[in-house]
Amino acid sequence: MQRVLELLLLSSTALAVIGDGFIALPVHKLQAGEGSAHFPNRLPIFDVVNGVAKSVEDDVNQIIQPIFGNGIFSGGSIQGTHSGNGHSVKYEVSLPSSSSQKGSNGPSSTDNKDTDPSKTGFSLDDLMNSIPTDFWNLIGLNKAPTSSDNGSKDADFTPSAVSQVEQPTSKSVESTAPGPASSASSSSSSEAASSSQPSEDSQPSSSANKKTGAFFLSLDNTQTLYTATLKVGSPAQEVQVMIDTGSSDLWFISSGNSQCKVNGGSIDCDKYGVFDKSKSSTWHDNKTDYSISYYDGDKASGTMGQDNITFADGFSIENANFAVIDNTTSSIGVFGVGYPELEAVKSKYTNLPFAMKEQNLIAKVAYSLYLDSRDAVQGYILFGGIDHAKYTGDLKAFDIVQSNDKYVYSQIPLTSVASSLNNYTNAYGLPAGSNHPKVGAVIYNGTDSFNGGVDLKDTPTLLDTGTTYSYLSKDQVESIVGLYGNVTYNDAGKAYEVPCWVGNPGNYLEFNFKNEQYIKVPTSEFVISVGTYASGAELCVFGILPGTHSILGDNFMRSVYAVFDLEDHVISIAQAAYNDNHAVVPIE
């Protein structure tokens, strides 16, 4: 049997918005190995830093892999569409210019609501008056607000950063009403943004001067993991990392990593970049050892310290805690955005999601995820905000399930899974008359009668962008695969075989959360072609794998819009809407 699995190497642009600004970040795809068994599975095994091995059942439930970015989106206008009162208004506003400010740098960031024209080249009033009247009417104002208005926050705008709405784009806004609570209300609020290009020489500013808002980083959809670039240290060094909702530590590969080819090892560390702490004037080594092991066999060990992390010019975290890895078999670092309980050191520290609030980049330790469709070039993670244009129906909030009375994993109850098969084209290999799966187990031909489905009994399930595939218990996976015929385990692929036609367009799985939210995922996300049988027929395996922990990875997450609130301990989900629109509202 010959197994073949090819993944394309793609590149795209990542976005960032902090406070009132938007920044574009370049990102690049990773190339995976062959077969489902070789996809990264970076579930931490235990904490080896302090010699204490926590039980796998207590200290696991995630796999690592997603990402971050860096770069700048330059723009000279505000562009967008605002919906309200049953209709929408498209707007594009060129920023006023002045002889006092020439060149491409645009207006500088400021915390002053009244912008100084001598410094920025235009005033706030100039900017507000440039926006069409229809926009202000939509949000309930008769005219543009001015710097002398001291009333409501219906339009508290500050021309302090970059914004845009065309793909790939992002925007930051201030809501006309209090931002959505952790329950992630689906009602939209008014929005606006300003446009500029940050200076190339921007340095991290103090937290007192930072504007609280929402920012997002666009992520490349590789179907294996997501990568982007961070700027680390002073002067900044660009290093690519993976972003993961299921882990909590940030670590970079050191230039001195013994496994790098340049140091006599076998790993091409230049591919994604390394961090040379000796070249950073702001690096501080706190003399704490760091070590972690993953289920895919990778290990990482090094030293914890602090330095400045820049998501885009002018938008940074000062003295961010992270590890510099001197010995690892991985070719790329990790950016975890989970609970501090998952940190691989005994003395817990303020990881980046919490540092973002601490340094006033966001008002709440919360972020939302939109990975877009399987074939999309990019998705994004939005820190401190919700993009109401990216889902359909209502966001439903679910309490995060604790582990041993602690908030450790970003997991919610999964009640059941059912299948809808509407396309039997090229169905083969089953006895005559048996192409249709078992009665009582699936939805037939698009009808809404489940007649059962697979009961998962509210299994606590991790929502993890760091996992390529998904995992359920062996019995649960076999029950789902059994919907499509005989259950056969493929030892080489470490997965269950499934008829390839199951992945035809129009077929889907429906995931039921507490009988309150139902997420439809195309079966094509779970049907993986890995080669051929001896007969020459195509061989496919199922992308929900047997495991000791329940995880919904990238092949599920592409179909859901998810808001992770690590303060109120809830995750809100809705069916993802694939479009180019944005309606960003900060979470307050």
Swiss-Prot record:
Residues 1-16 form the signal peptide. Its main location: secreted. Residues 94-109, 181-208 have a biased composition (Low complexity). It comes from the Eukaryota. Contrary to other SAPs, SAP7 is insensitive to pepstatin A inhibition, which is due restriction of the accessibility of pepstatin A to the active site by Met-242 and Thr-467. Gene3D superfamilies: Acid Proteases. The keyword Signal applies. It is found in: Secreted. N-glycosylated. One of its GO terms (biological process) is proteolysis. Coiled coil: none annotated. Induction: Expression is regulated by SSN6 and induced during host infection. InterPro entries: Aspartic_peptidase_A1 (IPR001461), Aspartic_peptidase_AS (IPR001969), PEPTIDASE_A1 (IPR033121), Peptidase_aspartic_dom_sf (IPR021109), SAP-like (IPR033876). Keywords: Aspartyl protease, Cleavage on pair of basic residues, Disulfide bond, Glycoprotein, Hydrolase, Protease, Secreted, Signal, Virulence, Zymogen. This is Secreted aspartic protease 7. It comes from Candida albicans (strain SC5314 / ATCC MYA-2876).
